[in-house]
């Protein structure tokens, strides 16, 4: 059986997922798309999804598909995911699951009422080979984790990028993947601002340092530096009782040229995690064929949203340690 996939939102990531489903992965075909900008939908169909029909709304795409991908503007995600759940259709939602934690909570409640998982959230780092290997090393070799030192650096960001986006657009990936890496929950968050880079702009305090504490007492520091200039650079070091382990660098050819030994640093986040997108979507398609969902859940999206909201509040009170309070995990997500 070939799954009929509908895509809601055919901007850069939606179109790339359409290409991935039709040309790289197995078991599915993109058969319906929609976008608020019809030109985007037409370009997607012409470029990578020639068999897809262009429909006028998310609801039409959901009705015409076996499973859907929500790749639209973040503020639209909640309503579109809820519509997919109501229709009983497996749904892959790019982050954020919802722009506010209470919206993500409504999605969790709707899925609970349905009685089975239908939502996978697009936290692709869980599928990255480096993170998977690091998690196994942490689990089997380091002893109990004590600390994590992490960094999320971008070469530059556009002028519309503002201080809170460092949390909701950037740190959100670390919030999820470090929780998954440790199999632990956050209990507090703190934000501090070092000296600002001259490469920032009005409305953006850059860099930032976010300090998190987990229920098991692990201390985490995450540097967010989105105007670092030199490249897209993701770092993660776990310090355990018996030793340390680092996230491996992306594969690149080291050279010895002109009396210099070195290797290139990637500039684009899409190149850094390109393989993990393939793995996460194949995981979604496999589960969707059984009428369910796998991978990062709506609960994971909800926890990330709660934590991000607290971190954003901490930006307004630099240095203050704020509690992260989570409700009990529902049995559906045990």
UniProtKB/Swiss-Prot annotation:
Protein purpose: Involved in the oxidation of myo-inositol (MI) to 2-keto-myo-inositol (2KMI or 2-inosose).
Name the record gives this protein: Inositol 2-dehydrogenase
One BP annotation, GO: inositol catabolic process
InterPro entries hit by this protein: Gfo-Idh-MocA_inositol_DH, Gfo/Idh/MocA-like_OxRdtase_C, Gfo/Idh/MocA-like_OxRdtase_N, MI/DCI_dehydrogenase, NAD(P)-bd_dom_sf
Binding partners and assembly: Homotetramer.
Molecular function GO labels: inositol 2-dehydrogenase (NAD+) activity; nucleotide binding
Gene behind the chain: iolG
UniProt catalytic activity: myo-inositol + NAD(+) = scyllo-inosose + NADH + H(+)
EC numbers: 1.1.1.18
Keyword presence, Oxidoreductase: yes
């Amino acid at each position: 059986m070939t799954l009929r996939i509908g895509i809601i939102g055919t901007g850069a990531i939606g179109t790339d997922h359409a290409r991935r489903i039709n040309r790289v992965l197995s078991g599915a075909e993109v058969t319906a798309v929609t976008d608020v900008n019809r030109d985007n939908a037409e370009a997607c169909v012409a470029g990578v999804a020639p068999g897809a029909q262009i429909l006028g709304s998310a609801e039409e795409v959901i009705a015409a598909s076996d499973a859907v991908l929500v790749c639209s503007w973040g503020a639209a995600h909640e309503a579109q995911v809820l519509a997919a759940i109501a229709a009983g259709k497996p749904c892959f939602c790019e982050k954020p699951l919802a722009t506010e934690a209470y919206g993500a909570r409504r999605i969790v409640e709707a899925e609970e009422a349905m009685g089975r998982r239908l939502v996978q959230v697009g936290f692709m780092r869980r599928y990255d080979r480096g993170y998977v290997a690091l998690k196994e090393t942490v689990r089997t070799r380091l002893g109990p984790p004590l600390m994590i030192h992490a960094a999320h650096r971008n070469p530059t960001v556009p002028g519309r990028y503002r201080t809170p986006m460092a949390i909701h657009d950037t740190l959100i990936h670390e919030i999820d993947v470090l929780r998954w890496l440790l199999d632990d929950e956050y209990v507090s968050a703190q934000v501090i601002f070092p000296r600002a880079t001259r490469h920032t702009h009005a409305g953006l305090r850059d860099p930032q340092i976010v300090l998190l504490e987990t229920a098991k007492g692990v201390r985490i520091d995450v540097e967010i530096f989105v105007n670092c200039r030199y490249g897209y650079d993701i770092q993660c070091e776990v310090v355990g009782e018996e030793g340390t382990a680092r996230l491996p660098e992306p594969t690149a050819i080291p050279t010895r040229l002109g009396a210099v030994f070195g290797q290139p640093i990637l500039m684009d986040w899409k190149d850094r995690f390109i393989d993990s997108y393939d793995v996460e979507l194949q995981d979604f398609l496999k589960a969707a064929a059984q009428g369910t969902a796998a991978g990062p859940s709506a609960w994971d999206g909800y926890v990330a949203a709660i934590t991000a909201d607290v971190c954003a509040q901490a930006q307004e009170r630099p240095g203050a340690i704020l509690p992260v309070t989570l409700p009990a995990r529902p049995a559906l997500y045990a």
